[in-house]
UniProtKB/Swiss-Prot annotation:
The lineage of its organism: Bacteria, Pseudomonadati, Pseudomonadota, Betaproteobacteria, Nitrosomonadales. Catalyzes the reversible reaction in which hydroxymethyl group from 5,10-methylenetetrahydrofolate is transferred onto alpha-ketoisovalerate to form ketopantoate. It comes from Nitrosospira multiformis (strain ATCC 25196 / NCIMB 11849 / C 71). GO terms for cellular component: cytoplasm. This is 3-methyl-2-oxobutanoate hydroxymethyltransferase. 3-methyl-2-oxobutanoate binds at residues 44-45, 83, 112. Signal peptide: none annotated. It comes from the Bacteria. Keywords: Cytoplasm, Magnesium, Metal-binding, Pantothenate biosynthesis, Transferase. Mg(2+) binds at residues 44, 83, 114. The keyword Glycosyltransferase does not apply. Pathway: Cofactor biosynthesis; (R)-pantothenate biosynthesis; (R)-pantoate from 3-methyl-2-oxobutanoate: step 1/2. Homodecamer; pentamer of dimers. The active site is at 181 (proton acceptor). Its cofactor is Mg(2+). The gene is panB.
Length: 263
């Protein structure tokens, strides 16, 4: 039986950390599930690591449907979260619902939508109609052109206050989880204390309810500059499955992320 969203709320309430890894195919879905990963994120990062694009912007809804179907076939119990790609959640709540419904039909248990309080109306529209939503704030890769590149968000007092306001608005709109990407650890901790829903961090410190890494980054498969929040868990492991087990254990015990992975 597949894990449901309420399990993660209880884990958050009990102080139990949640381990998340991106996943794009059936074989890795089965492996990640065996290794104890709680949530499989079908990320639009597939544009970077699978398609070879510089950004996630070219990824289409059909791409996300295809990879969600693949992951669903490989995982029997793990919770599946799927990104809504660029252009599929920005036009109107009604159009977003139609697109999200296709992802849910493909096997997603929750969709992830990038954007702050401007997306609150859309989040509310979806959640009131049975589609669970994870909101995504901080560094939102789909807005990389507007943000001026991949850099830390929430560094100034004004930016930090805005992100906190965004987080509260999105929870009030019905978001079941909130992902924060590349924000100062102290700010992520403040948001986590303020909200009652699970928070997910990537480059956001150890105080979030959950941690997520891109599968390829976790296995040391990357080119170019290594991001600060990355850690190669394959180093010293005897197999890929053992590497994932080491990651899951490090998240659950609070060993990862360390100070060297945060801002």
């Amino acid at each position: 039986m597949r894990i449901t969203q309420d399990v993660f709320q209880k884990m958050r309430d009990d102080g139990e950390k949640i381990a998340i890894v991106t996943c794009y195919d059936a074989s890795f879905a089965a492996l990640l599930e065996r290794a104890g990963v709680d949530i499989l994120l079908v990320g639009d990062s597939l544009g970077n690591v699978i398609q070879g694009e510089e950004t996630t912007l070219p990824v289409t809804l059909d791409d996300m449907i295809y990879h969600t179907l693949c992951v669903k076939r490989g995982a029997s119990t793990a919770f599946i979260m799927t990104d809504m790609p660029f252009g599929t959640s920005q036009v109107s709540p009604e159009e977003t619902f139609r697109n999200a419904a296709e992802l849910m039909a493909a096997g997603a248990n929750m969709v992830k939508i990038e954007g702050g309080s401007v997306m609150a109306e859309t989040v509310e529209f979806l959640t009131q109609r049975g589609i669970p939503v994870c909101a995504h704030i901080g560094l939102t890769p789909q807005s990389v052109n507007q943000l001026g590149g991949y850099k830390v968000q929430g560094k100034t007092d004004y930016e930090a206050e805005q992100l906190l306001e965004d987080a509260v608005a999105l929870e009030q709109a019905g978001a079941g989880m909130l992902l924060m990407e590349v924000v100062p650890a102290a700010l992520a901790a403040q948001v986590t204390r303020t909200l009652s829903i699970p928070t997910i961090g990537i480059g956001a410190g150890k105080d979030c309810s959950a941690q997520v890494l891109v599968l390829y980054d976790m296995l040391g498969i990357y080119s170019g500059k290594k991001a600060r929040f990355m850690k190669n868990f394959l180093t010293g492991a005897g197999s890929i499955e053992e590497a994932v087990q080491n990651y899951t254990r490090a998240v659950k015990t609070g060993e990862f992320p360390g100070p060297e992975h945060t801002f």
